[in-house]
């Protein structure tokens, strides 16, 4: 059950009186959503100034933008069908608490940021109560069989799509959708500053650098961490001149990776707090868990190896749901495999080490990926924060709320 100490209420909304200060409520469920939402907050603040406050569930980056997180984001940072069962009671209690708070004090608008399983269940009753609802980040309805789109139709007034092929899918279902590009494409430089990133992280000079990102959730790091470290050890034996950099998204994750590092003291490893962008910018190649980080690596124009491991039952459910043949965003956006994916039983230390070194040493492939990912970057760079803010403000204005 959610602790009483975190059952705060959100600041009251403004109703229809534009002269009063109002609240836009937002919920982000993990580190990637926190990053995306923080960038969106910048666009909203530019449009609305200080007439509106922002509250709900968010992380450190959102709070840096003035967001008030009434519940801990870590409650929602659980992934996978089996893994979520241990936290299900707390997750559902949190959703009931924020739902009741928002219905008692209606915000100007509710913005769900990714976390579709949590947010759609929250958005349906909020929209039914007349609260404008925008969902930022389309779920993978193009990867799953299409039953999910019926839930989306009940849940949202508008959906903001990160990728150019998505709005057409929603148009066929009669759901308002706008392609806004990806905010990371606006903030990641078109030309990476590799030397600057290495200097900032104080990485060893004269070494080729492998960035290692086993995930931003504890479940991910526990599933992949040992395998990744064993792969790093094999790479070190094959090329002792390699340096590794691993960004830990939180203090608990840092503790896990530091414990793993003790088993492989020979590794030339730099563990950094967060700062995944700089770690990838500094790298020659990236070994990482499937997720938003794969797109970040592509925007930094890096060769990479994508991996993922989930419990057997979770994997079987995912297979039955009809996933695409690839899970990494660079491959999905390309419509083909441009970087290797090693999943489940294929994600052995031997295979990960071999594929990562192949990616590191294939100069022709490195040149191809740099050009290919540059074109992808140009497509996704759309001034997302402004476009997304425009949709939200226009929706509120159509209801006479601002």
Curated annotation (Swiss-Prot):
GO MF annotation list: lipid-A-disaccharide synthase activity; phospholipid binding
Described function:
Condensation of UDP-2,3-diacylglucosamine and 2,3-diacylglucosamine-1-phosphate to form lipid A disaccharide, a precursor of lipid A, a phosphorylated glycolipid that anchors the lipopolysaccharide to the outer membrane of the cell.
SUPFAM superfamilies xrefs: UDP-Glycosyltransferase/glycogen phosphorylase
Q: What is this protein called?
A: Lipid-A-disaccharide synthase
One family from Pfam that matches here is LpxB
Alphabetical list of InterPro entries matching this protein: Glyco_trans_19
Keywords, A to Z, come to: Glycosyltransferase, Lipid A biosynthesis, Lipid biosynthesis, Lipid metabolism, Transferase
User: What's its catalytic activity?
Assistant: a lipid X + a UDP-2-N,3-O-bis[(3R)-3-hydroxyacyl]-alpha-D-glucosamine = a lipid A disaccharide + UDP + H(+)
Q: Which GO terms describe its cellular component?
A: membrane
From which source organism is this entry? Cupriavidus pinatubonensis (strain JMP 134 / LMG 1197)
Tell me its EC number(s), please: 2.4.1.182
Q: Which GO terms describe its biological process?
A: lipid A biosynthetic process
Q: Which Gene3D superfamilies does this entry report, sorted A to Z?
A: Glycogen Phosphorylase B
List the PANTHER family. Answer: LIPID-A-DISACCHARIDE SYNTHASE, LIPID-A-DISACCHARIDE SYNTHASE, MITOCHONDRIAL-RELATED
């Amino acid at each position: 059950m959610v602790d009483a100490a975190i059952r705060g209420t959100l600041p009251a909304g403004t109703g229809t009186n534009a002269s009063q200060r109002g609240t836009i409520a937002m919920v982000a469920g993990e580190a990637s959503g926190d990053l995306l939402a923080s960038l969106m907050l910048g666009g909203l603040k530019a449009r609305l100034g200080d007439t509106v406050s922002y509250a709900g569930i968010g992380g450190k980056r959102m709070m840096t933008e003035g967001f008030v997180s009434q519940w801990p984001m870590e409650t929602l940072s659980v992934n996978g069908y089996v893994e979520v069962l241990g936290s299900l009671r707390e997750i559902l209690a949190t959703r009931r608490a924020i739902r009741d708070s928002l219905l008692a004090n209606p915000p100007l608008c509710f913005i769900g940021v990714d976390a579709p399983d949590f947010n759609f269940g929250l958005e349906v009753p909020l929209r039914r109560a007349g609260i404008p609802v925008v969902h930022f980040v389309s779920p993978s309805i193009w990867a799953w069989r299409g039953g999910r789109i019926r839930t989306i139709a009940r849940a949202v007034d508008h959906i903001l799509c990160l990728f150019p092929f998505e709005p057409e899918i929603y148009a066929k279902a009669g759901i308002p959708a706008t392609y806004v590009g990806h905010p990371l494409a606006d903030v990641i430089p078109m030309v990476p500053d590799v030397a600057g990133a290495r200097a900032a992280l104080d990485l060893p000079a004269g070494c080729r650098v492998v960035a290692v990102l086993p995930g931003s959730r504890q479940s991910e790091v526990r599933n992949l961490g040992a395998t990744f470290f064993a792969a790093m050890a094999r790479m070190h034996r094959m090329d002792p001149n390699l340096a590794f950099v691993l960004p830990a998204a939180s203090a608990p994750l840092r503790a896990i990776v530091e414990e793993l590092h003790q088993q492989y003291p020979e590794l030339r490893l730099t563990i950094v707090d967060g700062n995944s962008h700089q770690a990838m910018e500094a790298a020659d190649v990236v070994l990482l868990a499937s997720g938003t980080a794969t797109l970040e690596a592509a925007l930094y124009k890096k060769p990479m190896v994508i991996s993922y491991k989930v419990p057997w039952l979770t994997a079987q459910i995912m297979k039955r749901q009809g996933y695409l043949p690839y899970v990494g965003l660079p491959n999905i956006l390309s419509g083909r495999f441009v970087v290797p994916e090693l999943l489940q039983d294929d994600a052995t230390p031997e295979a990960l080490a071999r594929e990562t070194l192949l990616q590191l040493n294939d100069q022709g492939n490195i040149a191809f990926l740099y050009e290919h990912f540059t074109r992808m970057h140009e497509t996704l760079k759309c001034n997302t924060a402004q476009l997304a803010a425009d949709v939200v403000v226009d929706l509120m204005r159509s209801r006479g709320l601002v």
